[in-house]
Every structure is written in structure tokens, then in C-alpha cells.
């Protein structure tokens, strides 16, 4: 329930079929993964290369750089505020740079998700602009920050 405060919203009902369809579907030019800590699954992440209309969706210039966007969450509250999220983001940024030639990584957290924003800043991400009414959440469009990490 706590994760749904920022991911999809509390008004979205998931079943095993909808979860499987969403989280196991292949992503073009990207990948999905379960985040583990000490061999226990604690979260989820996905990364995908921006192309075409995704640059427009993020209002981000398509200037020839290889740019990836990421979505992630740690779903177990007992693992929050322990540095695990920022460590994971640093590891993912290194993986994207070293294995996929990424030059930039983008995140788009809800502006009121202060805990996540602190973790992202701790990992080196910078807020570069506001994305007003960027994401549908609990029946209305909410404001997000566009955050960037140059690799």
C-alpha cells in the first residue's frame, strides 16, 4: 500500500495476471529486474533507452546522446532510508554506462515524494525541470520533477 502512494496510485487494483502482464512484459531497448538485498526481493526496477516520442514525453532534447530513463521502487518499508536505494541507483548507472553506452539517465519522481528525491540526489541526480501534470495518478495528472545524471 505504501508503494502505491507513488506508483500507479491506491485506486489501481492489481491481480497476479495484471502484475505479470505489466512487470514481465519485455521492454524495447531496456530491461526489468527485481531488486534484491541480502538475497531477499525488496523492490523492482526498469530501465529503457529514450527514443522518438519518449524525448517529447520528458520534454528532453534529442541531441544525439544515449539517454536512459529508469523507474524503481523499494516496496518493503523496513528497507527505506538505509542508503539501499541510492546504492542501487549508483550501481545501475554504472551498469548502463559500462554495458549500454548510456551518457545520461533520467528519473521523473512525483514532486511530493521527498524521500525518493533525497535518495536520487544522494546518488548524484540533479533536478533539471518541473514536468507539470506529467503522470496520471489516482485519477488526476500530477507534477513530477525531471532529474538527470550525466555519466
Q: What is each stretch, according to the model?
A:
Residues 1-21:
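A short, well-structured alpha-helix characteristic of acyl/acetyltransferase catalytic modules
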Residues 17-79, 150-151:
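Acetyl-CoA-dependent GNAT
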Residues 30, 142-146:
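Short hydrophobic/aromatic beta-strand or adjacent loop that forms the aromatic wall/cage
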Residues 75, 81-95, 117-122:
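Conserved acetyl-CoA-binding loop-helix of GNAT-fold acetyltransferases
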Residues 98-108:
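Conserved GNAT acetyl-CoA-binding A-motif
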Residues 107-117, 134-141:
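Conserved beta-strand-loop-alpha-helix junction that forms the acyl-donor binding cleft
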Residues 121-131:
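Conserved acetyl-CoA-binding loop of GNAT-fold acetyltransferases
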Amino acid at each position: 500500500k505504501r508503494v502505491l502512494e507513488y506508483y500507479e496510485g491506491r485506486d489501481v487494483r492489481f491481480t497476479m495476471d495484471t502484475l505479470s502482464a505489466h512487470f514481465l512484459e519485455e521492454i524495447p531497448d531496456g530491461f526489468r529486474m527485481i531488486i534484491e538485498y541480502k538475497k531477499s526481493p525488496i523492490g523492482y526496477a526498469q530501465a529503457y533507452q529514450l527514443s522518438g516520442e519518449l524525448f517529447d514525453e520528458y520534454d528532453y532534447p534529442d541531441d544525439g546522446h544515449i539517454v536512459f530513463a529508469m523507474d524503481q521502487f523499494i516496496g518493503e518499508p523496513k528497507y527505506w532510508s538505509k542508503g539501499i536505494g541510492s546504492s542501487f541507483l549508483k550501481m545501475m548507472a554504472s551498469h548502463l554506462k559500462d554495458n549500454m553506452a548510456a551518457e545520461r539517465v533520467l528519473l521523473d519522481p512525483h514532486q511530493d515524494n521527498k524521500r525518493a528525491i533525497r535518495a536520487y540526489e544522494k546518488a548524484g541526480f540533479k533536478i533539471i525541470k518541473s514536468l507539470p501534470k506529467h503522470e496520471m495518478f489516482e485519477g488526476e495528472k500530477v507534477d513530477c520533477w525531471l532529474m538527470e545524471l550525466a555519466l
